[in-house]
Every structure is written in structure tokens, then in C-alpha cells.
């Protein structure tokens, strides 16, 4: 499976194959009424006979098309028609416009109705490109739906500080090079103990630090940290020093000594853990840089800064994050690559359990194309990864669980297809690995990706907030948000199942077919197909999953 991850995340998407489509029930595919209208009174008998024959032919053709449509896999029952998804053709409208977006706020800058109307509009329409940078901050949880303008400004300031602190840690590691901890052993014991105390405190307050931070803290100017953090460090160090001074006067000196020893042992243990984290971080740094330099340039047409970046600005940023061998990149691509490095390293520091894995750059790249401020892009990525992070676990438990669900859906939706996959030893559905891992980023165009993701985010947020009272909403509310994406993958797969059954006789051919879907998928049709799968199969799949987990 790890080999599949490497293969699927590095393979370029093809564009040579055209997708199969289901028969349409739209009246536009049928002859107009005028073409079959009766002849005028002054027509001769021959024209009357010819027109009558033509009319009968059209009626027959309409009947055939109607019957064919009813027998199509895409046909739905009357019960299904009553359960319209937010993306049905009838409901689809223009994307949320800037004017509509502004009208959703009260004079205090608060979304009306707790954001209910906002979520409904976004999940059924999508978002105009000019306001995506603002809207995504709400969709991805950077700003609370009930926040005021003043509260959001405070959050923005705090989030910027937290991101800058993560950046400083990354810069420390970059300057330290190989991350040796020899200097730590050379420190006087008292000084080393003090640094351990600072390390433990910082760990508790802001998250994991590397062992090199313990060493670098000695030489770090106090201006590099917030004054409140300095005060906390001074208080802790002062408290630790005074505990030694009071020993002769206190009866519980032995207890204090034991407590101090325990503290140092705990701190040393934390340092050892962070040494291992630092070794991982060095590996992540190398992979991040390689992936950043190889990032595709499709985003450039959507980025607001793509044509405004000078060569000197791009090179300065690239050097600040340690990029090398970038002479082949134009300025806008180099700037984008440097931003990828900075934010992905900060995330690896923020979430060391996940760190970095190939494919994460695919998820971040669209966010960077939309949001120009690094600290805002970082926290949007954090919000995105809250749902996607289990896809990148080293044990692959998350991805295996999702592939298992894909397999169950196929088995219950199309037994003929499943039997064919069994014959090819592909029933584990690893051929949709890439779709699940990077959320259709490789199969959809860049604009389609942006549209799909923002609608998906709004849909998930709306369901969690209880928006909508259709049976579809109630069913989806019980499923983990990331499972929805699997349904999209299955919808795309089901649409092409006849090609797979009839043409392919090997796993490699199926993988190639999945990879060739780039640019051939209709986002709104994909969402509609996913809706029908959820309505018809969710309860059954949930029951099967629960019975197997017991």
C-alpha cells in the first residue's frame, strides 16, 4: 500500500480519455414540438401522409428514449425525486456574489441567523472567485460563524502571532542544520536544568518544540518572543532557583528535591522525544522541498499575485526557507514553492504526529492560490487537515478504512462489477487510492477542485449545524465528513463501471482509467450521484461496518 501511495501521488493525470455519461432525461435531447406539428390545411395528400409518418416516427423515438431512460442506472424512483440534494439541477443557481455576501452581515459584522443562510447559499451555489479568500476563513473554521468584526480582528492578530512563532521554530531548525544535541551535553548543569524548565513550559502552552530549541534558546534575543512569554519564563526560572535557596530553611527540603528531580527527569524525557521528532522533521524538510519545486503551475491562472511577483522578492523568500536548485522556475512559481515550504514546515511543527506526507502539498496548493496572507492560509490548511489528516497516518489505518467502505459500496451497488474486481484481485479498491488521498485534486481541474471543496466544506458545516430537514441531511449527519468524499469517488467509478467491466483485464488498466479522468468529470453531477448513493446505501453500509468491527 505504501508503494501505491508513492505511485498514485506522483503520477501525472492524463487527459486522453473521455468519460462515459448517463442518458439524459432533459427535454432538450428530444425533438421540439414544432418539428412534429400537423401540416397546414393547404398541404397535399402526399405531404400529409409524409408528415403523419414523420410524426409517428418521432412519437416512437420519444417512447424509446423514455423507456431507455427509465432503465438507465441513473434513473431514480419517485421516492428519490422527493429527496432532492442541494445540488440538483432544479436548485442550482449562480455562485454567491460579493453583493450577496455583504448583505449576509449585520452592522456589527455578524452573519445573520448564525450563518444558516450563508451555509445554505454556499452549499447549493458555490462561491464567486473574488470573495473566496474571505468566505473560506468561515468555512474552514478560522472564524466562528457567530463572531463579530471586532472578534475576528482579535482572532486574526492572535493567529498571526501563533503562526509567526511556528515559523521561528522552523528557522531555528534550518539554521541548526543537522540538529546535533551535543551542545546540550556541554551546558553547565544549572543552565541545562533551566532550559529544560523553559522547554517543558513552552511545550505545555504552545505545542511540541524540538530539542534544538532548548539549545537555541540560550542565544535567542528576547525580542524574538512575546513579552508575555518572557514573563512566564522568568517566573518559572525564578521559582526554580528560589526552591534551591530555601532548602536549608524548609522542613520539606527532601520533598522539594524529589519534586525537582522528577521535573528534570520528565523534562529530559521530553527532550528525548523531541530529538526523535527533530529527526523526522529533517526528513520532512527534504521531502517538502522536493514536492514544492515539482508543484504544477495550473494554480497560476487563479492566484491574485501570480503576475505581480518580482524575481528579487521570489528569491528572497526562497532563500529564507532554504530552497535550492530553483533557477528553472519563473518568479511566480518560485514564490509559490517557497510559500508551500514555509506553511508545510509550520504544519509539520504544529502537528508532529502527522508531520508531512506526499499529497499534502496538493491540498495546500489551491488554498495558497486563493489566500495571499500566509498566516490565514496556514490556519485554513489546519482546518482542512482536521478532516483529512487521518489520510496521512503512517499506519494507513485511515486510508484503509475508507477503501474498505468503497469496496462495500461497490459490492452492494453493483455485484457484477465487484465480481469482476475480485477476479482481478482488485476488490480492495486500491485503484481509487489517489482520489481518496488528495480529494480529487488530480482528477478535477483546478477550478473544479475549488468548487468541489468549498461546496463540500459548506455542506459538512451545514449538516453539523442541523441546516436542512430532508432525509438526505439526516442520513449524512451521522456519517464522518470525510466519508462523503468516498461517495464522490464511488459515484465517478459507478459512472464508468461498464468500461471497466467490458474493457479491462488487469489492475494496471483500471488505475490508468482512474488517472485519465482529469478534466472529464462534472462536479455537480458528481455531487448528485453521491447523494443518491448515500440515500440508498448509507444505512446498509453502516450496519455492515459496525458488525465487522464487533
From Swiss-Prot:
Q: What does the record say about induction? A: Induced by infection with the soil-born fungal pathogen Verticillium longisporum.
User: Subunit info?
Assistant: Interacts with AGT1 in peroxisome under biotic stress conditions.
GO CC annotations on file = nucleus; peroxisome
Q: What happens when the gene is disrupted?
A: No visible phenotype under normal growth conditions, but mutant plants exhibit increased susceptibility to the soil-born fungal pathogen Verticillium longisporum.
UniProt KW keywords: GTPase activation, Nucleus, Peroxisome, Plant defense
The GO terms this record gives for MF are: GTPase activator activity
Q: Which PROSITE patterns match?
A: TBC_RABGAP
Q: Where is the composition biased (Low complexity)?
A: 7-49
- Which tissues carry this protein? Expressed in root meristems, vascular tissues, guard cells, trichomes, styles and receptacles.
Q: Where is the Rab-GAP TBC domain?
A: 126-460
Which residues span the membrane?
none
Q: Which InterPro entries match?
A: Rab-GAP-TBC_dom, Rab-GAP_TBC_sf
Example of a GO biological process term: defense response
Alphabetized SUPFAM superfamilies for the sequence: Ypt/Rab-GAP domain of gyp1p (SSF47923)
Q: Organism, per UniProt?
A: Arabidopsis thaliana (Mouse-ear cress)
Q: Which gene encodes it?
A: RABGAP22
Q: Where in the cell is it found?
A: Nucleus; Peroxisome
Described function: Involved in defense response against fungal and bacterial pathogens. Acts as a negative regulator of jasmonate (JA) responses during infection by the soil-born fungal pathogen Verticillium longisporum. Involved in abscisic acid-dependent stomata closure in response to infection by V.longisporum and Pseudomonas syringae. May be a downstream component of brassinosteroid-mediated signaling.
Protein name per UniProt: Rab GTPase-activating protein 22
Identify the stretch(es) annotated as Disordered.
1-49
Domain of life of the native organism: Eukaryota
Amino acid at each position: 500500500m505504501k508503494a501505491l501511495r508513492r505511485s498514485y501521488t506522483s503520477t501525472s493525470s492524463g487527459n486522453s480519455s473521455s468519460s462515459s455519461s448517463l442518458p439524459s432525461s432533459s427535454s432538450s435531447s428530444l425533438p421540439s414540438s414544432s418539428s412534429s406539428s400537423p401540416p397546414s390545411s393547404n398541404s397535399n395528400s402526399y405531404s400529409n401522409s409524409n408528415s403523419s409518418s414523420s410524426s409517428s416516427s418521432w412519437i416512437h423515438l420519444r417512447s424509446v428514449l423514455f423507456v431507455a431512460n427509465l432503465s438507465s442506472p441513473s434513473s431514480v424512483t419517485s421516492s428519490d425525486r422527493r429527496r432532492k440534494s442541494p445540488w440538483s439541477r432544479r436548485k442550482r443557481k449562480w455562485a454567491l456574489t460579493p453583493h450577496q455576501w455583504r448583505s449576509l452581515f449585520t452592522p456589527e459584522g455578524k452573519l445573520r441567523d448564525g450563518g444558516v443562510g450563508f451555509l445554505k447559499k454556499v452549499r447549493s451555489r458555490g462561491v464567486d472567485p473574488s470573495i473566496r479568500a474571505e468566505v473560506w476563513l468561515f468555512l474552514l473554521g478560522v472564524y466562528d460563524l457567530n463572531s463579530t468584526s471586532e472578534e475576528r480582528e482579535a482572532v486574526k492578530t492572535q493567529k498571526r502571532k501563533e503562526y509567526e512563532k511556528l515559523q521561528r521554530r522552523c528557522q531555528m531548525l534550518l539554521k541548526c542544520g543537522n540538529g546535533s544535541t551535543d551542545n546540550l551535553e556541554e551546558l553547565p548543569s544549572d543552565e541545562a536544568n533551566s532550559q529544560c524548565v523553559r522547554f517543558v513550559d513552552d511545550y505545555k502552552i504552545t505545542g511540541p518544540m524540538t530539542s534544538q530549541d532548548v539549545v537555541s534558546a540560550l542565544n535567542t534575543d528576547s525580542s524574538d518572543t512575546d513579552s508575555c512569554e518572557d514573563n512566564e519564563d522568568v517566573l518559572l526560572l525564578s521559582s526554580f532557583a528560589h526552591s534551591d535557596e530555601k532548602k536549608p530553611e524548609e522542613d520539606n527540603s527532601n520533598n522539594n528535591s524529589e519534586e525537582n528531580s522528577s521535573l528534570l527527569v520528565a523534562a529530559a524525557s521530553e527532550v528525548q522525544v523531541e530529538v526523535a521528532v527533530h529527526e523526522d522533521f529533517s526528513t520532512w524538510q527534504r521531502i517538502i522541498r522536493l514536492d514544492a519545486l515539482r508543484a504544477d503551475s495550473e494554480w497560476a491562472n487563479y492566484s491574485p499575485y501570480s503576475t505581480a511577483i518580482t524575481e528579487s522578492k521570489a528569491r528572497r523568500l526562497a532563500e529564507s526557507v532554504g530552497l535550492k536548485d530553483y533557477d528553472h522556475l519563473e518568479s511566480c512559481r518560485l514564490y509559490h514553492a517557497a510559500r508551500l515550504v514555509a506553511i508545510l514546515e509550520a504544519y509539520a511543527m504544529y502537528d508532529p504526529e502527522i508531520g508531512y506526507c506526499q499529497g499534502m502539498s496538493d491540498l495546500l496548493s489551491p488554498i495558497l492560490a486563493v489566500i495571499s496572507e500566509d498566516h490565514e492560509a496556514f490556519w485554513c490548511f489546519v482546518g482542512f487537515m482536521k478532516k483529512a489528516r487521518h489520510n496521512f497516518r503512517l499506519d494507513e489505518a485511515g486510508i484503509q478504512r475508507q477503501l474498505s467502505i468503497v469496496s462495500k459500496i461497490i459490492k452492494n451497488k453493483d455485484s457484477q462489477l465487484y465480481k469482476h474486481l475480485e477476479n482481478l484481485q482488485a476488490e480492495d479498491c486500491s485503484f481509487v487510492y489517489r482520489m481518496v488521498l488528495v480529494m480529487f485534486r488530480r482528477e478535477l481541474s483546478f477550478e473544479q477542485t475549488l468548487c468541489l471543496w468549498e461546496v463540500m466544506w459548506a455542506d459538512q458545516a451545514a449538516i453539523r449545524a442541523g441546516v436542512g430537514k430532508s432525509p438526505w441531511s439526516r442520513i449524512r449527519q451521522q456519517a464522518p465528513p470525510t466519508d462523503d468524499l468516498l461517495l464522490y469517488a464511488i459515484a465517478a467509478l459507478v459512472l464508468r463501471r461498464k468500461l471497466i467491466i467490458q474493457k479491462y483485464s488487469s489492475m494496471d488498466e483500471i488505475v490508468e482509467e482512474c488517472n485519465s479522468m482529469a478534466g472529464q468529470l462534472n462536479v455537480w453531477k458528481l455531487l448528485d450521484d453521491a447523494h443518491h448513493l448515500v440515500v440508498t446505501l448509507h444505512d446498509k453500509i453502516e450496519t455492515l461496518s459496525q458488525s465487522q468491527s464487533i
